[in-house]
Regions:
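Short beta-strand segments enriched in hydrophobic/aromatic residues
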Residues: 20, 37, 98-100, 131-133
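Surface-exposed, charged secondary-structure patches
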Residues: 42-43, 47-105
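Short, surface-exposed coil-to-beta transition loops
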Residues: 78-81, 109-115
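Hydrophobic pocket/interface hotspot
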Residues: 16, 33, 41, 94, ...
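A short, polar/proline- and glycine-enriched secondary-structure boundary/capping micro-motif
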Residues: 54-57, 105-108, 136-144
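Short, low-complexity N-terminal intrinsically disordered segments enriched in polar/charged residues
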Residues: 1-36, 146-148
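Short beta-strand edge/turn micro-motifs at domain boundaries
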Residues: 111-139
Length: 148
């Protein structure tokens, strides 16, 4: 195992959030993030940039090209606030609830859900796809109280 970020689902999710978070003008950890994603991984916002419905489907390079200008110019910290995880054999599906903030502790920008599909190849975990959507009028995060 050469990538400590890929040893567990927890380490993958933590590294994913850490890699895109930072202050305006701070370089993001794109290569760290790339190393979490399978070479054929897809990243899919469930809403268009205009806010309307419809998926934009990106490979990793397309995702970086679409997000880097905003992240380079803005303080942006994405923090996991809850999770639902389902595993079967070498596959896992994680619903990761997040807050995006302008500072690590404040300045709430938005909240949403990342639907992350992962696979263990016998040596490490890979992100195969991530689809996400944000809260908006008429759509709120579900209750995050842990279920028994």
């Amino acid at each position: 195992m050469s990538n400590p970020d890929a040893v567990s689902i927890d380490s993958v999710i933590q590294a994913m959030y850490e890699s895109i978070s930072g202050g305006a003008g701070e370089p993001r950890q794109w290569e760290r993030d790339r190393a979490l994603h399978h070479p054929k991984a897809l990243l899919v916002p469930a809403r268009q940039a205009s806010g309307g419905p419809g998926a934009g489907v990106f490979d990793f390079d397309g995702f970086v090209a679409s997000r880097a200008p905003y992240l380079d110019a803005n303080d942006f910290y994405e923090i996991e606030i809850g999770r639902r995880e389902f595993r079967f054999g070498a596959i896992a599906h994680v619903l990761s609830f997040y807050e995006a903030r302008s500072t690590p502790e404040g300045g709430l920008l938005r909240r949403g859900v990342n639907s992350i599909q992962l696979m263990h190849d016998g040596e490490r975990w890979w992100i195969l796809s991530t689809v996400w959507d944000n809260e908006r009028e008429g759509l709120s995060l579900p209750d995050l109280t842990p279920s028994n």
